[in-house]
Swiss-Prot record:
The keyword Nucleotidyltransferase applies. Belongs to the bacterial reverse transcriptase family. Pfam families: RVT_1. The keyword Metal-binding applies. It comes from the Bacteria. This is Retron Eco8 reverse transcriptase. Its EC number is 2.7.7.49. Keywords: Antiviral defense, Magnesium, Metal-binding, Nucleotidyltransferase, RNA-binding, RNA-directed DNA polymerase, Transferase. Residues 25-252 form the Reverse transcriptase domain.
Length: 374
């Protein structure tokens, strides 16, 4: 097998590939690459979570794009990581566990917020040449870190953080967590347990008939390993089951156990909305009512520019919303069928159901496109 060549970023690589025009003046005048300022970042609240969006006009934003493309994506990761990786997906996170007799899902509490910036520096330093970028004032690694970290005004006690919402944060989280993935994977291998991770979600399965994954011992061991890097388990999201487990709308079931092959399917709740939408369309319920009631889409009055054309605008809006919703769900279901064709792990009865839903969706899309009346 061909070994992937280790990447090493040096001053020339930074200037010609990563920075380009972004900090050209700093390079010429030999002034340090600055940290990301508060005026370059917008804070977005979503429930109890805070996301950070860097302005597209920020030079750091352009550096982040190139860091992802030319640097971070070339750093090797642990095989357990299934999110934020090329070819990764939620289904690939679930698929290794179809042989399980018992299951355990653990959630890492405040995943991004608890990534230590010291661990970020330690994890990236082997791939960045130990040299100065600006005279003897700023090391190359510090210049790069200034483009991926942020001193949040609402988390001053943390210093520099890897903000949830920065385009480089997902890749960096996998790189930093690689050490932890390896420790957990090694522990699980000794116990005959399968492990995979999707961002902050960790899934474990045991092919053998055993109560290990439901024991305090197992949870304590994983907790102990996570604590090495300052991570904790979110106890409220702990799930352990035998024969079948439902996670985020997906169900893994293996009634046979003892290493037999199980299957994956979508839960009834995951399909509930699209089935209600297609049923409502079959009953010729107005598009506006369907959008308002089932997909929770409602046209705001302020978005209607011309009162005289309100009815026409509203009809087109809800028609387009339905087409977009059905088209998106159609693509999603097709991805399940394609995944099954490669991995043979989706429940066969469910594949039949999917094909029926796909046929209904396609017929409704065609009808909506032809129909110009509500």
């Amino acid at each position: 097998m061909k070994t992937k060549k280790m990447i090493l970023v040096d001053k020339v690589f930074y200037e010609k590939i990563l920075s380009v025009e972004s900090f050209k003046e700093n390079i010429i005048t030999q002034s340090a690459i600055p940290k990301i300022s508060n005026k370059e970042v917008r804070l977005i609240s979503s429930g109890s979570k805070i996301f950070y969006a860097i302005n597209n006009t920020s030079p750091h934003s352009h550096v982040q794009l190139r860091l992802n493309r030319f640097f971070l994506s070339h750093i090797p990761l642990n095989s357990a990581a299934k999110a934020f990786v090329r070819g990764g997906s939620y289904l690939k996170y679930l698929e290794p566990h179809i042989y399980g007799s018992s299951y355990c899902r653990l959630d890492i509490s405040s995943f991004f917020n608890n990534i230590s910036f010291d661990d970020v520096k330690q994890s990236l330093s082997p791939y960045i040449k130990d040299e100065y970028l600006i005279g003897t004032e700023q090391k190359l690694i510090d210049a790069i870190l200034n483009s991926v970290g942020y001193e949040s005004p609402i988390r001053k006690d943390k210093g520099m953080i890897i903000p949830m919402g920065f385009r480089t944060s997902p890749a960096i989280s996998n790189i930093v967590f690689r050490k932890m993935d390896l420790l957990i994977q090694d522990f699980c291998a000794k116990k005959g347990v399968i492990y995979s991770r999707y961002a902050d979600d960790m899934l474990f399965s045991n092919p053998r008939e055993s109560k290990l994954l439901m024991s305090d011992y197992f949870i304590d061991e994983i907790s102990s390993l996570l604590s090495i890097m300052g991570f904790n388990i979110n106890q409220s999201k702990y799930i352990s089951r035998e024969k079948e487990i439902s996670i985020n709308g997906y169900v893994i079931e293996n009634k046979g156990g003892n290493g037999s092959i199980g299957t994956i399917r979508l839960s009834k709740s995951k399909l509930n909305t699209v089935l209600k939408v297609t049923h409502a369309l079959a009953q010729n319920i107005p598009y506006k009512n369907i959008c308002n009631k089932y997909i929770k889409v409602r046209l705001k009055e302020k978005n209607i520019k011309y009162e005289s054309k309100k009815d026409e605008f509203e009809k087109k809006y809800y028609r387009d919303q339905l087409i977009n919703y059905l088209g998106g769900y159609r693509s999603y279901l097709i991805s399940l069928v394609k995944f099954h064709s490669e991995y043979k792990c989706v429940n066969s009865d469910f594949i039949i159901q999917i094909n029926g839903i796909l046929n209904d969706i396609q017929n409704h899309i065609q009808k909506i496109k032809k129909n110009r009346r509500l």
